[in-house]
Amino acid sequence: MNQPIYLIGARGCGKTTTGEALARALAYGFADTDRWLREHTQMTVAEVVEKEGWPGFRARESEALQAVTAPATVVATGGGMVLRDENREFMRAHGVVIYLNVPVEVLAQRLEAFPEAGQRPTLTGKPVTEEIADVLAVRDALYRECAHHVIDAADAPAVIVSRIIDALQVAHAS
């Protein structure tokens, strides 16, 4: 198997950290759509949103997804990548989609411990835990609809990588 592997999930679920570790374990390349966007626009996510609005950012996010997709590549996507139908369809058609599922409380702890100042504007203006709960209430169904595999990602990256590899091997064997 050398299809791209797309990691989806909420902000703070570990897509980049887990993605880098998974890419090393599989000897795959690694790409991050947010990083690609920053490098190609020379703006942070917050700056893109301020300048172009959320619709402009979402369009650029779709462009990034298509640009980084390549065989034998792990792709960490932005948390809102699943909001556009075409992105969900593209990922499912071109690779294996893994939803890194993490409870709201764990996401809140991670985001409070490692704030991404200037990286990602608040979506609702609410406190972190409340915002995450609101966002997941909308997006969880989209993550699940898009994913080939749902992985419990509340543990250390090495444990999560092991779970993903197990899921990929089981799927490949069947």
From Swiss-Prot:
Top-level class of the enzyme under EC nomenclature: transferase
Localization: Cytoplasm
Q: Which residues bind ATP?
A: 12-17, 120
Q: What is its main location?
A: cytoplasm
Q: Which SUPFAM superfamilies match?
A: P-loop containing nucleoside triphosphate hydrolases (SSF52540)
UniProt keywords (A-Z) are: Amino-acid biosynthesis, Aromatic amino acid biosynthesis, ATP-binding, Cytoplasm, Kinase, Magnesium, Metal-binding, Nucleotide-binding, Transferase
Report the co-factor binding details.
Binds 1 Mg(2+) ion per subunit.
UniProt keyword Membrane present? no
Binding-site positions, substrate: 34, 58, 79, 139
Pathway(s)? Metabolic intermediate biosynthesis; chorismate biosynthesis; chorismate from D-erythrose 4-phosphate and phosphoenolpyruvate: step 5/7
Q: Name one GO cellular component term.
A: cytosol
Protein EC:
2.7.1.71
What ranges does the record give for the region LID domain, renumbered to this chain?
112-126
* Cited PROSITE patterns: SHIKIMATE_KINASE
In terms of superkingdom, the source organism counts as Bacteria
What InterPro entries does the record tag this protein with? P-loop_NTPase, Shikimate/glucono_kinase, Shikimate_kinase/TSH1, Shikimate_kinase_2, Shikimate_kinase_CS
User: What does it catalyze?
Assistant: shikimate + ATP = 3-phosphoshikimate + ADP + H(+)
> Which cofactor is essential here?
Mg(2+)
* Binding site residues for Mg(2+): 16, 32
Quote the function comment for this protein: Catalyzes the specific phosphorylation of the 3-hydroxyl group of shikimic acid using ATP as a cosubstrate.
What does the annotation say about its assembly with partners? Answer: Monomer.
What is written about domains in the entry's comments?
The LID domain closes over the active site upon ATP binding.
- Family from the record: Belongs to the shikimate kinase family. AroL subfamily.
**Protein name (database record):** Shikimate kinase 2
Origin organism is Cronobacter sakazakii (strain ATCC BAA-894) (Enterobacter sakazakii)
